[in-house]
Every structure is written in C-alpha cells, then in structure tokens.
C-alpha cells in the first residue's frame, strides 16, 4: 500500500531534529496528497499509518490531524474530518488528553483551526462541543471560552515541550497541582455549606438534611470513592516531587494524562461492576446525551 502511494503521488515524510520535541516537517508532496485526495485517503486501510513511524507514532495524532486541518473546509467536510479523527485514534495509545475524548456527531458543533502562537507550536485544532447539562470536573481545566454560551471548546495543540512560559490554555504544573489539591474534598465541602446555609428554623430538619446529604455523597459521589482518592493522592505526591526539577513541562503533562487515564479506567470499571454503586455525578466529560467512552 505504502509503495503504491509513494509511486503514484511521489510523496515522502521528512523528520527533522529539533529542540522542540515532536516537531516534524511534512514535505510539499504529502500536503498535495492530503489536499487533492482527502476523500480517498480517508477510505484507505489505516493499518499502513500505524506502521509508518514518520507519519504517526502512538501519540502524534494531533500533528497529523493538524496537517489535514490545513487543507480541509470544515463547513463542507466535517463528517469526513470526524471519520478521519476517529479512524486515526484507533491506532494510537490514549496517552495524551486529545486521545481520551470520544466525540460523536451528536456532541460536535463545529471544528476550527488553531494557529500556533510560539516557536515549535504549529497550531492544532479546536473542537466545539455541546455544553453538558451540569458542572463538570473538566471545567477546572483551562479551556477556550466560546462566544456561544451553549458550547465548550477544547484546543488540541501539537506542541510537546510544554514549558512555564506557556499561556493559560496549556496544562501547566501550577494548574495541575491546583486541579488535584482543589479536587473533590473542597467541592463537596462547598456543597455541604450550601445546604447548611439555607434558612431553616427547625434544628431537626437541618440535621435530617445534613445526614441525607452525607449519605448521598457516600454512595453516589465518584469524587469520594476510595480508589479515586488513592489515585489522586498518588499523583499529587508525584507532581509535588517535580516542583524543583528543571524541564519538567512534559513530565508534568505526562503525569496529568496518566492520572486522567487511571481515573477513566476506574470509572469504566465502576460502570461495569455489579458490586460498586453507579455514581450519579459525571467524569471525563461524560455527556448526558449520546456519549461513548473509549475503552
């Protein structure tokens, strides 16, 4: 397959050494192939992509998708893009955040290009999604604010050397620590305070509400699950150990992604388990409407 493509379109991939991790240079012929033969490219067998190290190597999905972004009219070819994204994702390990999402046509509103704003960052793409009906843990993570109030926008970037100079829309060490340290305990405490703050004259009624709320958290809150708290504590400690280490940007990001991945696996196990309660609250951007979790 690869040999036939090379002979027909005369394209190749050049990898360039760079001080920016994951920085690639795609030749003109490969750009032409994507631009002029996008539909046929999507319909091909994707197994050759997995074997072709230069195009995509486990976690390089956002880079190849960015390249496709440059030559796709999203208004006309959104369905094709979604198909390409989902197909490419099958050949990747869910190591980075962009691979953990499992969008479908019912949750995607629009897709747009994102320009690079620093050396080594070639840009990426932004997926605008329908806003979930309740507050999400993901809202504690920096994201692009959309002009549409009914929309959440996530920017998938292609830069892999995340450093302290990065702007607020990147996953920085301080953000990571904030997400972990201001996690479930503080959220639940605030909810309890809200309950107790209600003006109820009857002390007995207050006690009943408090007991009822405690039981609800004990049984139904994913954020009080013992395994969740253990995983959170483990990664909090790992992250704190990196505070004084140089060039820790990528390590922090890897830690954060591994943390999210472990929680995703935990949630899937809970959903599939008969012995554990099925919590009412959501995690990993789970939509109430049609939504699939990538296993």
Curated annotation (Swiss-Prot):
Keywords: Chloroplast, Plastid. It is found in: Plastid, Chloroplast. Its main location: plastid. It comes from the Eukaryota. One of its GO terms (cellular component) is chloroplast. This is Uncharacterized 35.4 kDa protein in rbcL-atpE intergenic region. It comes from Euglena gracilis.
């Amino acid at each position: 397959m690869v040999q036939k493509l090379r002979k027909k379109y005369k394209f190749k991939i050049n990898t360039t050494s760079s001080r920016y991790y994951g920085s690639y240079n795609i030749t003109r012929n490969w750009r032409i192939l994507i631009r002029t033969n996008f539909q046929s490219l999507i319909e091909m067998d994707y197994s050759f992509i997995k074997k072709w190290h230069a195009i995509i190597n486990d976690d390089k999905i956002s880079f190849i998708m960015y390249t496709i972004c440059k030559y796709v009219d999203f208004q006309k070819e959104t369905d094709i893009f979604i198909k390409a994204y989902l197909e490419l994702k099958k050949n990747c390990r869910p190591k980075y955040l962009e691979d953990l999402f499992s969008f479908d046509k019912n949750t995607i509103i629009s897709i747009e290009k994102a320009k690079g704003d620093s050396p080594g960052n070639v840009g990426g793409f932004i997926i605008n999604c329908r806003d979930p009906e309740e507050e999400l843990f993901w809202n504690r993570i920096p994201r692009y604010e959309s002009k549409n109030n009914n929309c959440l926008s996530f920017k998938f970037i292609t830069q892999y050397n995340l450093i302290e100079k990065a702007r607020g829309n990147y996953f920085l060490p301080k953000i990571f620590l904030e997400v972990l340290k201001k996690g479930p305990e503080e959220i639940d405490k605030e909810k309890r305070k809200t309950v107790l703050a209600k003006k109820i004259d009857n002390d007995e009624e207050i006690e009943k509400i408090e007991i009822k709320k405690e039981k609800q958290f004990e049984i139904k809150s994913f954020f009080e699950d013992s395994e969740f708290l253990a995983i959170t504590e483990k990664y909090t400690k790992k992250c704190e150990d990196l505070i004084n280490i140089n060039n820790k940007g990528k390590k922090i990001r890897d830690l954060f992604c591994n943390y999210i991945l472990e929680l995703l696996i935990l949630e899937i196990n809970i959903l599939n388990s008969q012995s554990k309660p099925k919590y009412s609250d959501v995690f990993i951007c789970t939509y109430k409407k049609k939504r699939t979790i990538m296993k």
